[in-house]
Each structure stands twice: as C-alpha cells, then as structure tokens.
Amino acid sequence: TIKTKDKDGQHMNNMDLGYEMFCYQCEQTANGKGCTKLGVCGKTPEIANLQDLLIFQIKGISCYGKVLQNEGHHIDKNIIRFIENVLFTTLTNVNFDSKVHVELLNESQRIKENLRTITGEIHNQTSYATYDLPETKTQMLKDAQFAGIMYDKSLDPDIRSLRQTILYGLKGISAYGHQARELGY
C-alpha cells in the first residue's frame, strides 16, 4: 500500500476530501474547479483513479531510470515508449477502458521490478519507487486514493499546480510523440 500521512500521522487522500475522483485536466471541468463525481467528458471515478495510479507508477519507474541514466546507462526504448503511451492514455478523452488501464498498470509493475533488479536498492526510496502494485483491480482502486492529485492536503497549492502543469505539458508532448510513431516517424 502507498504510505502517505499528514504532519499528525493521519492518512490523506482524495476521498478524505469527499471526492470520488478529482480531475481538473481540461477546460470542461465542473464549475471551472475540477470534476469530483464524474467527469464532464464522461470519465468515471474508476478511470480517474486508475489513471492517477498509472501516473504514480511511472513516477516510480522514473526513480529507477534516473539512477540508470546517472550511471551512464541508456534506457530501453520500449520503456520510453511505454511511459509515452501511459502519458498519452491518461490525456482527457483518449481512453476510458478500465481493462486497458489495468493492463498498463500490470506492465508498469513488471517494468519497475525489472529496473529494481538492474539497479538494486536506490537512494531515492520514495513511495513511488517502493510501491508494489496489488494483483486485483479492486485493491488497485483502494490504493489509487493515495496517488491522486489532492492526496497531500499539506502541499502548497502553488507547488501542486506547478507539478500538474509540468505533467500536463508532458502529456501534451507525448501526444505528439504518439502520433508521430503512429505515422511511422
């Protein structure tokens, strides 16, 4: 399970705020503040939460990838392609198929475990790096509540916004990469 606690040692997550989901990725968000029960675009809480967990997982993969890069290794193009695909898949209105999301989550865990084997224990032992994905979708959805945008109530809103802006920029770049790959470039 993902361990995330506030300064008093209490767990925090999107659900603590009374949200089934939280998404403010697009201009369609409810009242311009974010969708919390169902996306205006049709995104369900299940998909939103699986997407949050996918992003959490690729952050973990990146912890190991950074170690390999620092040691002078090149990252396998299949891993880069996978991360690009996850970023593209989590864009608004791209893919709302929970089966695909669970398959991507399982693949993310295989990649992370493979990178762990290569790197051994790393210095950056964040919850992103140490988290192990459970086997069932039900448990994944329980864990996803700790991977959401609003999980850390103590995080400065400007820092949260900056992190999300960077993430959305990466998602946009991945869309171009994905389309170029589809066209054979």
Language model: regions and residue ranges:
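Short, Lys/Arg-enriched N-terminal segments with co-localized hydrophobic residues
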Residues: 1-12
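Metallocofactor- and cofactor-centric catalytic cores in central/energy metabolism, strongly enriched
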Residues: 13-185
